[in-house]
A protein has these predicted regions:
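Active-site-proximal catalytic alpha-helix in oxidoreductases
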Residues: 173-186
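A short beta-strand/loop micro-motif in the catalytic core of glycosyltransferases
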Residues: 120-121, 141
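A conserved active-site-flanking secondary-structure segment within enzyme catalytic domains
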Residues: 136-165, 204
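Amphipathic alpha-helical segments enriched in hydrophobic/aromatic residues interleaved with Lys/Arg
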Residues: 163-176
Length: 323
């Protein structure tokens, strides 16, 4: 019985989780927090940095608690301080609105910290906050896929990397959306403490880290889909049911509000949209199917419509790369 108890206690010791370093000489990462920040954008990297033995300080402009995009309340360690000496600064994404982007105090603090910090890294659409300071001008950057066009439009002096999960400009680093912050954090650990330490951390948190690959949202098949104009006035989008796939196949599902007598209106609109985008009709005459050659690769899009009531129907879009 004593032997069993000893083994049990040993297992408990092995399972203990240590907090981040409190050593003043440890590599020091500051994490910007703001109202509406996306939790995974900073919690994931904090876990990585803590496991790597870094010291971490979370900061908000006034030191007050913030509420994340998912409703989690987080109290930072402190308010902004010009005296704080950081080795790296992490800028997460989330509800990045005009109020935040136009906040002079936030922008000036980031620029001030960037002068002494060895590294500055944005996660997800935190790239907008970083780009707004001018620190990304002339550099390559990435962000969450759904913000690509907006980012490119708003920051023409920044080269957008649509096919990267992580960009490394030496001092300035950016990552794609959400969980990509973990990849960026591991890459920063590799720069500071070496690849072996970074891989050890990845193993400890049971994360399949692929520094030069993995799931890259900007490479997924839906990148070739055209952008549709507004729906006809008698058709209403009720819900987006699903949206998933990989590099060769993509599926989208929608529910539309449309009277049974006007079903043909949606089919006609789809045909017009695809034709305007340069796609060619494929299959039978009445089939909702089109093909297109994109960078010497043939893609086929098929749409199936199914009426669920007199006033609603579902649409399933299937995009496939042809071999």
């Amino acid at each position: 019985m004593k032997q069993v108890m000893v083994l049990w206690l040993m297992c408990l010791c092995c399972m203990q989780v240590k907090a981040h370093s409190t050593d003043d000489n440890a590599f020091h990462v500051g994490v910007l927090l703001f109202e509406g920040a996306q939790a995974i954008d900073f919690v994931g990297p904090i876990e990585v940095f803590g496991q790597a033995g870094f010291r971490i300080t979370t900061l908000s402009k006034d030191g007050e608690a913030i509420t994340t995009a998912m409703g989690l309340q987080v109290t930072p360690h402190q308010a902004f301080s010009q005296e704080l000496q950081l080795d790296a600064l992490l800028i997460p994404g989330g509800n990045v609105n005009d109020r935040l982007l136009n906040d002079v105090t936030v922008a000036q603090w980031i620029k001030a910290q960037s002068k002494s910090a060895r590294y500055v890294m944005s996660v997800c659409n935190g790239a907008f906050i970083l780009a707004n300071t001018g620190l990304l001008d002339g550099l390559r950057a990435t962000t969450i896929e759904k913000a690509f066009n907006s980012f490119e439009h708003n920051y023409p002096n920044v080269t957008l990397a649509r096919d990267k999960k992580f960009t490394d400009n030496g001092k300035i680093l950016t990552t794609a959306g959400l969980s990509s912050g973990i990849d960026g954090a591991l890459s920063l650990v590799a720069k500071v403490r070496g690849a072996k330490v970074a891989r050890t951390v990845a193993a400890k948190i049971e994360y399949n880290w692929q520094p030069n690959g993995g799931y890259i949202r900007g490479k997924m098949a839906d990148r070739v889909l055209p952008q549709f104009d507004n729906l006809p006035k008698d058709v209403a989008l009720l819900s987006r049911v699903f949206h998933y796939g990989d590099e060769t196949t993509w599926h989208k599902g929608y529910t539309f509000g449309i009277d049974e007598s006007k079903t043909e209106l949606l089919s006609t609109w789809l045909n017009q949209q695809m034709t305007n985008a340069g796609w060619q009709k494929a299959g039978a005459k009445n089939a909702l199917a089109w093909s297109n050659n994109v960078n010497n690769t043939i893609w086929l899009l098929h749409v199936s419509l199914k009426r669920t009531s007199e006033t609603e129907l579902t649409a399933h879009l299937t995009l496939t790369q042809q071999i």
